[in-house]
């Protein structure tokens, strides 16, 4: 589970963003900006909500507040955007990425650093955020990166 959770960690997300930038700088830059925006929003939400982490012996040490899960929010944004861009070309990659998003959330619960509601809350916020971005992109074709 620690390997799975790595793909939602700061370092894991940065590495994937760098790979996206190398592959296509426009799309990679756009995804990196949205990842950064959501990461900042996540930290603001954590401070405002100030929910303590679960009172269990965690398998990894995490600092700070629990809600919403940053791993869930940011991985949903990044891997969700990549899945969106692959959807018309290679649906299997998109489906695998959604499975990775799900596994990252499950890993955070399994490792004892989040409640289920922390992960679901992160997913719901990111789902709403991505839908807003994609609707905006479709309504403003000049912003389309596909």
Q: Predicted segment positions?
A:
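Hydrophobic alpha-helical bundle signature of multipass membrane enzymes
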Residues: 1-62, 74, 80-99
């Amino acid at each position: 589970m620690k390997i799975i959770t790595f793909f939602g960690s700061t370092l894991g997300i940065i590495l994937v963003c760098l790979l996206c930038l190398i592959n296509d700088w426009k799309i990679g830059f756009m995804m990196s900006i949205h990842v950064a925006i959501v990461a900042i929003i996540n930290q603001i939400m954590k401070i405002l909500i100030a929910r303590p982490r679960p009172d269990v012996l965690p398998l990894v040490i995490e600092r700070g507040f629990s809600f919403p899960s940053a791993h869930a929010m940011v991985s949903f944004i990044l891997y969700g955007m990549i899945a969106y861009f692959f959807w018309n070309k290679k649906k299997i990659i998109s489906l695998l990425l959604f499975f990775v998003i799900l596994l990252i959330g499950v890993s955070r619960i399994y490792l004892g650093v989040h409640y289920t509601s922390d992960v679901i809350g992160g997913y719901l916020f990111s789902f709403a955020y991505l839908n807003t971005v994609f609707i905006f992109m479709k309504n403003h074709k000049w912003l389309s990166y596909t």
